[in-house]
Design a protein with these regions (language model features):
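Short, intrinsically disordered, charge-balanced linker/junction segments flanking boundaries
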Residues: 245-254
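Alpha-helical residues within the helix-turn-helix
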Residues: 95, 242, 246
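Alpha-helical promoter-recognition and RNA polymerase-docking modules of transcription initiation factors
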Residues: 9-212, 216-230
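Short, charged, surface-exposed loops that flank catalytic or proteolytic processing sites
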Residues: 233-240
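Short, contiguous pre-domain boundary segments
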Residues: 5-7
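Intrinsic, short, N-terminal disordered tails of RNA polymerase sigma-factor systems
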Residues: 1-3
Length: 254
């Protein structure tokens, strides 16, 4: 996928390939616990609730200016996150919107209060449900990144480097999380395999080299790139495995 349509967003990056970088990435994702069948049911329900709320927001924004402004500000927040490779603070968000922080806070509050009132809910409860959905979505993605790597390895030597394939497969995984319906009786790994494979094979077919990933994953990967760039700039040398391992808080010998 050359671009992500996810509601949590994505940011463009380029990998500098190499077995060392892949090894560090695998160490990092390997520390995430796998999900039980019960976990999948609970998390998928929260994700589906989140997706319904976001569809509802887009629909209501067509007729309610306060919600439309909230939606525009959220889209700006996402673009800024893509630019910064991390979710912006309220101050960074306000600067990007070119408005005072107080005005930003007021617009967000008014947007949520208007939205909540239209669906007979409470603003705090609405925001809590959205937060739960985002966290559930990220949890499902993080817990299945090892499956992405396993699938990507089957498609090596077809014109794209393994790390690029991993990124494309992650986008397929992201889509699977959005679509998964636990009531159909499938385990998520079975369901997501098709989406992961589709993301990878589509990328191979188009030979796409510019990849987009969810922000929470690019944050992790860009920490490595940042160390490489800082050491090259400040010390005039290439970052060692020890430097990168220290940044990721993993053992160099693991």
């Amino acid at each position: 996928l050359p671009a992500s349509s996810s509601s949590t967003g994505s940011a463009p990056i380029r990998w500098s390939g190499g077995n060392d970088l892949l090894r560090l990435y695998l160490q990092d994702i390997g520390r995430v616990d796998l999900l039980t069948a019960e976990d999948e049911v609970l998390l998928s329900r929260l994700v589906q609730q989140y997706e319904r709320l976001k569809r509802e927001e887009r629909h209501l924004a067509e007729e309610h200016p306060a919600i439309e402004r909230l939606l525009c500000l959220e889209e700006l927040q996402l673009r800024e996150a893509n630019h910064l490779s991390h979710w912006p603070t309220r101050q960074e968000w306000a600067r990007a919107a070119e408005i005072p922080l107080q005005e930003l806070n007021q617009a967000i509050t008014k947007g949520y209060e208007t939205w909540a009132g239209l669906i007979d809910s409470d603003s705090r409860e609405l925001q809590r449900r959205l937060r739960e959905g985002r966290k559930a979505r990220d949890r499902m993605i993080q817990a299945n990144l090892r499956l992405v790597v396993a699938v990507a390895k089957k498609y090596q030597h077809r014109g794209m480097e393994l790390l690029d394939l991993v990124q494309e497969g992650t986008l397929g995984l992201e889509r699977a999380v959005e679509k998964f319906d636990s009531t159909r009786g499938f385990r998520f790994s079975t369901y997501s395999y098709w989406w992961i494979r589709q993301g990878i094979t589509r990328a191979i077919a188009t030979q796409s080299r510019t990849i987009r990933l969810p922000v929470h994953i690019t944050e992790k990967l860009n920490r490595i790139k940042r160390v490489q760039q800082e050491i090259a700039s400040n010390e005039g040398r290439t970052a060692s495995m020890s430097d990168l391992a220290k940044e990721l808080s993993v053992s160099e010998d693991t």
